Amino acid sequence: MGKITFFEDRSFQGRCYECSSDCPNLQTYFSRCNSVRVDSGCWMLYERPNYQGHQYFLRRGEYPDYQQWMGFSDSIRSCCLIPQHSGTYRMRIYEKDDFRGQMSEITDDCLSLQDRFHFSEIHSLNVMEGCWVLYEMPSYRGRQYLLRPGEYRRYLDWGAANAKVGSFRRVMDFY
């Protein structure tokens, strides 16, 4: 079970809302979100209702302003608790759509796709075990995309506008 608290103002001030499960529409509870406290679990926050728009991965900790979670604004309109995973993590990445081209099997985090694999685009992937977060830029920066187990035949399937990937990591409650 997870627990997250949203605050309208920075530094955990103003009206707050505590949440312990997925919520497709947070607009009824607060109008803006400038700070967050994650007491337990890993969460994905979304800038729009129904799990749409920019995504932000948060794990246990305190985030006194939205820039701490790489937010573009104070708009958080939905959230989901990411299921805990205790086994191994496995994902296959491909250089072309529909699982074609060069394939690499991944079992751990990658700070820089370019440095490790000498390419910077992933066109399709298959998450076999665990949940992962892809980042648009190296060092876990830029736009973020939650990947649950399943097949993603093209980058549009995980919500990206292009195939650019800079880094990725396993969703874990600790690092």
Curated annotation (Swiss-Prot):
Transmembrane segments: none annotated. Gene3D superfamilies: Crystallins. GO terms for biological process: eye development; lens development in camera-type eye; lens fiber cell development; lens fiber cell morphogenesis. It holds the Pfam family Crystall. Keywords: Eye lens protein, Repeat. Residues 84-88 are annotated as: Connecting peptide. SMART domains: XTALbg. The keyword Repeat applies. One of its GO terms (molecular function) is structural constituent of eye lens. It comes from the Eukaryota. One of its GO terms (cellular component) is nucleus. Residues 2-40, 41-83, 89-129, 130-172 form the Beta/gamma crystallin 'Greek key' domain. SUPFAM superfamilies: gamma-Crystallin-like. There are six different gamma crystallins identified in mouse lens. Has a two-domain beta-structure, folded into four very similar Greek key motifs. PANTHER family: BETA/GAMMA CRYSTALLIN, GAMMA-CRYSTALLIN B. Belongs to the beta/gamma-crystallin family. Crystallins are the dominant structural components of the vertebrate eye lens. This is Gamma-crystallin B. It comes from Mus musculus.
